[in-house]
From Swiss-Prot:
Annotated protein name in UniProt: PI-stichotoxin-Hcr2l
Lineage, top ranks: Eukaryota, Metazoa, Cnidaria, Anthozoa, Hexacorallia
Species the sequence originates in: Radianthus crispa
Other noteworthy facts: A synonymy between H.magnifica and R.crispa is controversial.
UniProt keyword Chaperone, yes or no: no
Keywords in alphabetical order: Disulfide bond, Ion channel impairing toxin, Nematocyst, Protease inhibitor, Secreted, Serine protease inhibitor, Toxin
Assigned protein family: Belongs to the venom Kunitz-type family. Sea anemone type 2 potassium channel toxin subfamily.
Length: 15
C-alpha cells in the first residue's frame, strides 16, 4: 500500500 505502516514503502506515505 502507501501508508507509513509499511516499512517496505519509503517516501510519500499517508500518516
Amino acid at each position: 500500500g502507501s501508508t507509513c505502516l509499511e516499512p517496505k514503502v519509503v517516501g510519500p506515505c499517508k500518516a
